[in-house]
Amino acid sequence: MSDPVAFAAMRSLLAARPSRSPRSGGGIATGAVGIDAALGGGLPRGRVTELISAAAGSGGELVFASLLASTRQARLRVALVDAADGFAPKSFRPDLLRHLLWVRARSLPEAMACADVLVRDGNYAVLVLDVRGIPARVLNRQPNSVWHRLRLAAEQHSAAVLVQSSAAVVRSAPWRLILREPAALAALRRTRDERAAALTAELARGHPRNIDILTA
């Protein structure tokens, strides 16, 4: 899907599609080797993983592009809640967007409400909540209870939730990875896939372990 949907339209879309009981356990490969290795194989189902892009160009978009390709191959749906209007679909191949639901939120509270609805729906293997671009003062005003609610919903519905941020905001996240270094100029001459494969992340929270990767 190359066009975003608003909150109300998202509710109508989900209402027309029966909810599913997602598969429990296991993980979902992002396709970015360094990220998957740090997580013990991929994004764990039933958990919130926070991916911090500490500097511009440090690789957050590469991880998302790789995730879209990996889930497309595995025939898994992805939902993106875009809290700061940062998603640029024209930079992605059209075939990578066919399994993506893109929700453009008008505010952080609306973004959190969208994420809460989607994580409980069961039709999406991965929920990505992108809060990069939201000012730190706004994020810091977000009650801890809202993040805790998202974490509980992920656990109850076996959803893999990826929060993309610029600094640590999800205090209750079981997993936190940090992309610290922007890409060197020489790396920009490589393909997107090559740059994604070369990414490395610091594991700031969590305990890597081998998990079963789910496919179609």
Region locations from a protein language model:
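Conserved RecA-like P-loop NTPase ATPase core
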Residues: I35, L51, L100, L127, ...
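Hydrophobic/aromatic beta-strand patches that form the interior of the parallel beta-sheet core
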Residues: T49, A79-V81, L101-V103, L162, ...
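Conserved inter-motif catalytic segment of the P-loop NTP-binding fold
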Residues: S66, A74-R137
